[in-house]
Amino acid sequence: MEQSEKTLDMIVNLCKNRGYVFPGSEIYGGLANSWDYGPLGVEFKNNVKKAWLKKFVQESPYNVGLDAAIIMNPQTWVTTGHVSSFSDPLLDCRACKARHRADKLIGEEHPEVNVDAMSFDEMDAFIAEHEDIVCPVCGKHDFTPIRKFNLMFKTAIGVTEDSSSTCYLRPETAQGIFVNFANIQRTTRRKLPFGVCQVGKAFRNEITPGNFTFRTREFEQMECEFFCKPGTDLDWFAYWKDYCENWLLSLGIKKEHLRLRDHEPAELAFYSRATTDIEYAFPFTDWGELWGIADRTNYDLTRHQEASGKSLEYFDSETNEHYIPYVIEPSLGCDRVALAFLCEAYDEEHLTDSKGKEDVRTVLRLHPALAPYKCAVLPLSKKLGEKAMEIRNELSKYFMVDYDDTGSIGKRYRREDEIGTPFCITVDFDTVGDEAKGIAADNCVTVRDRNTMEQVRMPISELKSYIESKIEF
């Protein structure tokens, strides 16, 4: 199935019907762009996180992990500028009172314009000059001036709500790494270069979330802050671009569905020396940002050092000098990359049986490392349930295993294909034999491959090693 033939509705329907993702708070009418990961979705998303940690922490000679608090001292966000300037350009349609993001209105009507490089005043002027930019709701060109809309969720700590109790849900996980730089370097005795990786929730009060789990107000990030000596940063920037792209390719994303887009100088954040986005060809857009890799220089550590009065310098014993490290940041949205893996894996295969009847097989061709269930154990008859459950219980010590003894074997295969289970293990009467008839058990099972539908006979004792070999990436 070509990428252009896929639609977001196909992905959403599969996710809802098969327990990957449900609308949040659905019995109360839901909550806009709130999604709950169901039984299969939580296993799948956990596997995405495990795959990231495997390559970025476990196998990396440079990186260590961290799990920082979601609610931080509010001075953190004053220092970084989030309190004063982490905002979207908001305007209202005077005719119908609908509220919109100005940059989105400009970008949709004039994609040739680099809206990221425009100030709020420049956006105001551009909209005023271009009457083809109209309200998507009523079609009128009559807007209020742009105003800032801060994206942070504000809350309060303690029993009173005043300015002294104000705090925020973190809008990014990166700052928890920066404020812990000295603690991590001291306790791990790491020398530059080294990185700190974190998986965790972040929150942004987005004006226009949408496209399923692509953009939501509550999301999970997988971020690495890689600290290096100034002057070596661009080499490491290139290293991490390749490393990130290779991770995606190793888990089944096709190279032709990815592109690396370097930011133009006008797009760069003022503190950034270079930024590259790895973009994916989502079915609902031409290209959508998947992974941002940025050279943040020493901006964050310098700001925190100045505001806190605590030294965040690194002593280089080889050169006998003190300096603030530069930082390369590969930042990836877990929910967004999980959606990309689902879009990549979704397939509808048109088949014709021996009688000439046409059929459509829906298959989720997830890499086995990401699949919620690594295998499913299917007894050919319920009379074989005891042996089948014995196999299931043994394999479940090492993998997530499904068990299904309801319906024809063909229908069970199709169910497993649709949820992405890479291998189906069929227990038949040859497996257990028939002592009364003098037929010895062969202690073998039939293993069916999801992608090819090919079947092989295999000893039960070899199942674990066989599946393990397929999970590696």
Cite the ranges covered by each PLM segment.
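NTP/phosphate- and nucleic-acid-binding module
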Residues: M1-F473
